[in-house]
Amino acid sequence: MFDVTLLILLGLAALGFISHNTTVAVSILVLIIVRVTPLNTFFPWIEKQGLTVGIIILTIGVMAPIASGSLPPSTLIHSFVNWKSLVAIAIGVFVSWLGGRGVTLMGSQPQLVAGLLVGTVLGVALFRGVPVGPLIAAGLVSLIIGKQ
């Protein structure tokens, strides 16, 4: 039996390898392994909790320098007096807000998810982006189409 989904995943993994983006390639290969093994029973959990687990792991990575002490408290304090750091804080707040809108939109309009995912995978694979794009992209879409 011909599995079109598997073929698409293999194509996306190949795109990840061709573009030297191991994040995309490894992620898709893990999903392929899950798909073709008895682990496929975990897909409902992955679909429901995967985004949350991914955000937790991403947050751990971002917060690690603070927790390890390699980013001293004095640097954090100085971020409130440097104009570039203040811009970074403002942009961080804005992007977090967009991501929140994106999560809401993806839940309320699942027909948009496919386009967001394809765009994100292409952005990650071709432009060396990172796969946080669907949430922010969905937030931007929500601003354009007027949905929360």
Swiss-Prot record:
Its main location: membrane. Pfam families: DUF441. InterPro entries: UPF0756_TM. The keyword Transmembrane helix applies. It comes from the Bacteria. The keyword Isomerase does not apply. The chain crosses the membrane at residues 14-34, 51-71, 86-106, 121-141. This is UPF0756 membrane protein CKO_01811. It comes from Citrobacter koseri (strain ATCC BAA-895 / CDC 4225-83 / SGSC4696).
